[in-house]
Amino acid sequence: MTAKTIDLNADLGESFGHYTMGNDSAMLDIVTSANVACGFHGGDPEVMAETFRIAREKGVSVGSHPGFPDLWGFGRRVMPFTPAQIERIVAYQIGAAQALATYSGHRMTYMKTHGALGNLTERDPAVAEAIVNAVKAVDANLPIMAIALSHLERIGRERGLTVFSEIFADRAYTEDGHLVSRKEPGAVLHDADFAAARAVRMVQNGAIETISGKMLPTRIDTICVHGDNAESVEVARKVRAGFEAAGIAVRALT
């Protein structure tokens, strides 16, 4: 059955100090949910507060976006943390986002992991379990966005969390439904028209479309457009326009 609504999310608030990442203000005119970096892979208190403030003014839902403490690698390198350490770095970042969202007059309403930490939840159940432990310890009522078909999606639901299943508009998928490594050619989709058409097909069919065109059925609640690419704003605009043209309403989940 064709989905009647979909959430459109983006990873934002990733600038820090003198370094600027993406065009957050433009993206916040398009997306319905913003995953805000918490200072470990990107972001700092000034950027976080400003992102929450603009999101509040534009009516965009916000979530914490914890990652590995790796500013120079942008959180895209796997780091050798134990599950117990992962629990603490996730709890720390959720708390920072909650505090600065409240400070900025907004409310943080979900959590989504970033980069290498998020990718590990596809393949490593111990990492997924650690993230669920952290969320339940900090706020058992906090929903999570989890990569569709991942261990985090499964374990989160098994342990009673509200889980929003996420696919990606601008990333290629392997034949088993995992994200193609960014080290591989074609892992990131830069053609906005192609990305938008594929996003509509996936949501209409309730399935991930792999690099060969195979469709893998899955629940889909939200779709991500990354905010740090040169084409991000164009891709986001065309994805949203594609949904609306197909009769799929774009609305926040929280």
Curated annotation (Swiss-Prot):
Keywords (A to Z) from UniProt: ATP-binding, Hydrolase, Nucleotide-binding
Top EC category: hydrolase
EC number assigned by the record: 3.5.2.9
Catalytic activity field: 5-oxo-L-proline + ATP + 2 H2O = L-glutamate + ADP + phosphate + H(+)
GO biological processes: carbohydrate metabolic process
Pfam families, per database record: LamB_YcsF
Keyword Hydrolase: yes
Keyword set includes Cell membrane: no
Domain of life: Bacteria
Subunit comment: Forms a complex composed of PxpA, PxpB and PxpC.
HAMAP family: PxpA
Protein family membership: Belongs to the LamB/PxpA family.
Name this protein carries in UniProt: 5-oxoprolinase subunit A
Annotated source species: Gluconobacter oxydans (strain 621H)
